[in-house]
Amino acid sequence: MRVDVLTIFPEMFTGFLNTSIIKRAREQGRLEVNLVNIRAYARNKHRNVDDYPFGGGPGMVMQAEPLFLAVEDLLPGGEAARPPVILMSPQGEAFNQGMAEELAREEHLILICGHYEGVDERVRLALVTREISIGDYVLTGGELPAMVIIDAVTRLLPGVLGAPEGAREDSFAMGLLEYPQYTRPRSFRGLEVPEVLLSGNHEQIRRWRRQQALERTWRRRPDLLARVNLSPEDRRFLEEISRREGERTP
């Protein structure tokens, strides 16, 4: 996969691109990240890419022309060869695992990192194909959201993770929060590893993990359960949790 990132702060990506899974994916040739400095496309001697908003108001607005020129420079094949052009924006769709899986099927992505008070609306009208938000909060710019998207998508690329089942069993990949994980030692400061995980009985372990994931989701993110394909056994387990909690409530 190729990801072009349009940014005015390419140096922010140095550590991100050279550590952990992202570094390995790049070394394996499974991920190519091309950092494009938007200022290189500014047509003024000071390389400014922002200006005052028409109609007045606080802050500055990112100009349309440098963004159009940068994207057009990345697409020598023209409109027919255009990949998704995604603007990092608090007005965008909320990013989730399903969206990561969708984007992981693309061969090429272009991510635009906004700054200042936002971007000229003509970028949305005539250049961007999608807007994505990573949450209902304000960040200085789109660089961190772009890193989040690259990380989530890269994990899903074939061959990137050593154990493919790891990506499938991560929180949200199954629609549920992940079950508790333990490693050695078996006992730590009076806290013991659940016996079922030491039993060697794979069916009991599978059932325990499923129930733990269900209960954790029920307690922390009950909204997710509406989108999960629950078995009759799952439903009975959740009903039992609900009944027990009801008995504890005065």
UniProtKB/Swiss-Prot annotation:
* Enzyme Commission (EC) number: 2.1.1.228
Q: What broad class describes the main subcellular location of this protein?
A: cytoplasm
Which InterPro entries would you find in this protein's record?
Alpha/beta_knot_MTases, tRNA_m1G_MeTrfase_C_sf, tRNA_m1G_MeTrfase_TrmD, tRNA_m1G_MTases_N, tRNA_MeTrfase_TRMD/TRM10
Q: Name one Pfam family in it.
A: tRNA_m1G_MT
- Give compartment(s): Cytoplasm
UniProt keyword tRNA processing, yes or no: yes
Enzyme kind, highest EC tier: transferase
Q: Name one GO molecular function term.
A: tRNA (guanine(37)-N1)-methyltransferase activity
Give the catalytic activity.
Answer: guanosine(37) in tRNA + S-adenosyl-L-methionine = N(1)-methylguanosine(37) in tRNA + S-adenosyl-L-homocysteine + H(+)
Query: Which key words tag this protein in UniProt?
Result: Cytoplasm, Methyltransferase, S-adenosyl-L-methionine, Transferase, tRNA processing
Q: So where does S-adenosyl-L-methionine get bound?
A: 114, 134-139
Signal sequence span per UniProt?
none
The GO biological-process annotations, alphabetized, read as: tRNA N1-guanine methylation
Q: Name one GO cellular component term.
A: cytosol
| Domain of life per record | Bacteria
Described function: Specifically methylates guanosine-37 in various tRNAs.
Give the protein family. Belongs to the RNA methyltransferase TrmD family.
Q: How does it assemble?
A: Homodimer.
| Name of the protein described by the UniProt record | tRNA (guanine-N(1)-)-methyltransferase
The organism is: Moorella thermoacetica (strain ATCC 39073 / JCM 9320)
Q: What is the lineage of its organism?
A: Bacteria, Bacillati, Bacillota, Clostridia, Moorellales
